[in-house]
UniProtKB/Swiss-Prot annotation:
Disulfide bonds join 107-332. The active site is at 94 (proton acceptor), 332 (s-methylcysteine intermediate). Residues 100-321 form the Radical SAM core domain. Gene3D superfamilies: 1.10.150.530, Aldolase class I (3.20.20.70). Its EC number is 2.1.1.192. This is Probable dual-specificity RNA methyltransferase RlmN. Binds 1 [4Fe-4S] cluster. The cluster is coordinated with 3 cysteines and an exchangeable S-adenosyl-L-methionine. Reaction proceeds by a ping-pong mechanism involving intermediate methylation of a conserved cysteine residue. InterPro entries: Aldolase_TIM, Methyltransferase_A, RlmN_N, RNA_MTrfase_RlmN, rRNA_lsu_MTrfase_RlmN/Cfr, rSAM. GO terms for biological process: rRNA base methylation; tRNA methylation. It holds the Pfam family RlmN_N. It catalyses: adenosine(2503) in 23S rRNA + 2 reduced [2Fe-2S]-[ferredoxin] + 2 S-adenosyl-L-methionine = 2-methyladenosine(2503) in 23S rRNA + 5'-deoxyadenosine + L-methionine + 2 oxidized [2Fe-2S]-[ferredoxin] + S-adenosyl-L-homocysteine; adenosine(37) in tRNA + 2 reduced [2Fe-2S]-[ferredoxin] + 2 S-adenosyl-L-methionine = 2-methyladenosine(37) in tRNA + 5'-deoxyadenosine + L-methionine + 2 oxidized [2Fe-2S]-[ferredoxin] + S-adenosyl-L-homocysteine. [4Fe-4S] cluster binds at residues 114, 118, 121.
Length: 349
């Protein structure tokens, strides 16, 4: 049986330099390889024509580019596209392409499933199977047909990015480095429930935007909706955020799904104003998308507008996020590959 080759895709410049040294290739070959990967986006090592034939053959013995196309796609009536990817371990993940008038955003996954078990999220109901490598995360960007149209990237797909932060930070380095994609960090937003072990490290090691899943300003209620609150509370998250400056390039936002009869009254808006006082941020209000076996409901637009207007009038910039891809289960909280995982015989935790 042939030994699987190691993917070059998802490797940082430092890692490529180590590979080059190990193979006895000239030092400058590392930047040639990263250029072929992240600028020209080749599919095979044979296409790296400024490497000598000898060095290409040496590289091919143990390595491959490692790009793999989606195995399935679903298209929404609103233009949103949901892509299904199979990982080398035969796990399944989803990514969502969201075109808009002057923007094109890709929502990527960082894990197969998720440990956080948020009450309102289908990925959380799926349970956790595996972390994704930098290769598997970057492949979602590398391998969609619309990759050259992308203006923005959000880590809001399957999984908790801070629970797989080593790999997420590698991807962010590749995307924002001169040797990689060369993107501005302002094009990228990472969303998290706010894990303590990852929050400060992310803020210190990355300049990308941060989105915190709040969903209620009341800790006792947040514990019911989001078990992660038990380990690290929303008030502790806010305490840490006060130590950072979000008034310049990096943007801080709070995600707030509005549930009927749960967190939709202006009492909650008032508490949000108190909680966020002194922090430069915005609140994104999100309509709840019903998922199976969850006894939560969304609210009407009138309620959303009243909530937004209260926040704005009291000094907290707020927006209502447009729902996209609901008809193909691609909207916020609706991603799940539980069906595919079950069909291949994976035991979900």
């Amino acid at each position: 049986m042939e030994t699987p080759k190691t993917a070059l895709l998802g490797r940082t410049l430092d890692e490529i330099q180590q590979i080059v040294r190990n193979l006895g290739m000239p030092k400058f070959a590392a930047k040639q390889i990263t250029s072929w990967l992240y600028d020209k986006k080749v599919e095979t090592i044979d296409e790296m024509t400024n490497l000598s034939l000898k060095h290409r053959e040496a590289l091919k013995e143990g390595y491959e580019v490692g790009a793999s196309a989606p195995v399935e796609e679903m298209r929404s009536v609103d233009g949103t596209v949901k892509y299904l990817f199979r990982t080398p371990a035969h796990n399944f993940i989803e990514a969502v392409y969201i075109p808009d008038e002057d923007r094109a955003t890709l929502c990527v996954s960082s894990q197969v499933g998720c440990k956080m078990n948020c009450k309102f999220c289908m990925t959380g109901k799926q349970g956790f199977t595996a972390n994704l490598s930098a290769h598997q995360i970057l492949n979602q960007i590398y391998s969609i047909p619309e990759r050259e149209k992308l203006t923005n990237l959000v880590f809001m797909g399957m999984g908790e990015p801070f629970d797989n932060l080593d790999e997420v930070l590698k991807v962010l380095e590749i995307l924002t480095s001169e040797y990689g994609y060369g993107w501005s960090p302002k094009r990228i937003t990472v969303s998290s429930v706010g894990l303590k072990k990852g929050l400060e490290r992310f803020l210190n090691e990355s300049d990308c935007h941060l989105a915190i899943s709040m969903h209620t300003p009341i800790p006792s209620q947040r514990r019911d909706l989001m078990p992660a609150e038990k380990a690290f509370s929303i008030t502790e998250i806010i305490d840490i955020l006060h130590n950072y400056d979000f008034s310049k390039q990096r943007r801080l936002s709070f995600e707030y799904i509005v549930f009927k009869g749960v967190n939709d009254s202006l009492i909650y808006a008032k508490e949000i104003v108190k909680l966020l006082r002194g922090i430069e941020c915005r609140v994104n209000l999100i309509r709840f998308h019903a998922i199976p076996n969850v006894d939560l409901e969304g609210v009407d637009m009138e309620t959303m507008v009243a909530f937004r207007d209260y926040l704005t009038q009291h000094g907290v910039f707020a927006t209502i996020r447009a729902s996209r891809g609901e008809d193909i289960f691609a909207a916020c909280g609706m991603l799940s590959t539980a069906k595919q995982q079950k069909e291949k015989g994976v035991t979900l935790q």
